[in-house]
Amino acid sequence: MQTYRTEGNYRSADRLSAAELRTAMASHEILQSTALAFDTARQLRFELGGVRAVMPFEQCADGAETGSVRDIAVLTRVGRPTCFVIEELDTDEAGQPCYRLSRAEAQRMCKADYLDALRPGDILPCTVTHIEPFGAFCDVGCGISALLPIDCMSVSRISSPADRVSVGQQILCAI
């Protein structure tokens, strides 16, 4: 069974062998790598085990194919760990091998197998990704965001969520 984590906490695909990558592809294992670029074809570029990999825009986040994800949300993945499943091994226009990746599929798997099964009172590990005056946005698994409202952070009055949490901090949250 797949264990779902926040982005940055999956097995890195950067130095895996071709055989290990094929095994991960066959089992739909969620891996991660740092996105190297967002190109003019609107796809994220990676390198896995010395082989080029691309993630088409529609596969960069669940909802991207319907237009509910903006380019800036994908562009901000560059230089950061990004989780995905390997969809296929294809060849590019030059005849070189190229992996096709999907973060959207990893997110759909996380929702269906993990998040949708949570009940009130369940505790889940989160990573704070962004702080606003009204609360903190947290990665609850595979880059899926959830809001932790300011009034749920403290029993005493605080002026800012930054009084209790910081970006990158790993916390436990109750549903």
Describe the role of every protein-language-model region.
Residues 1-174:
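Single-stranded RNA-binding regions, centering on S1/OB-family and related RNA-binding modules
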